[in-house]
Amino acid sequence: MLVPLPVAAPPAPPAVPVLLAEGRLALAFRRGEGRFPSGDPIWWLELRRNGSTVVRWPAASGIASRQAADRRWSPGNAAPLPPGLYRLGRPEAWAGSYWIDLSPRFPTSRSALGIHTCLPGSGCICLPNAADTAAVAGWIRRAGITQLTVLN
């Protein structure tokens, strides 16, 4: 059973002018530096406008010991998400938080991928803090964000 662990307090919300700025919002996911206390590498889920990060949330993807595993063709191996473009599903209430379905827009045998609250990591995007998952779900709904790019 995956049990959420607390992490540092979420970042302060962006200033109102940033939220009202012109430009399309997009979600990107990238490998960061450092590790959670669980040993999972830190990744960043970033809300971007015109290529600049507006806000970001710490996340995990894949379990710590499977970071170098095949990311595209081995379902169930707990590797991080493969790089590429994903279609985002509508956020759904799930296990006291949210599930946001991820559908790869490229050939892969991976399935049942999503964004949800968990830590240690799984083969999904795991946000350790339910408040962060709720914030991401809110942005997706309000801004009509329909895709995510996994950068690395």
State each model region's role.
Residues 2-119, 134-145, 151-152:
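Cell wall/extracellular polymer interaction/catalysis modules
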Residues 126, 149-150:
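Structural signal for conserved beta-strand scaffold positions within catalytic alpha/beta enzyme cores
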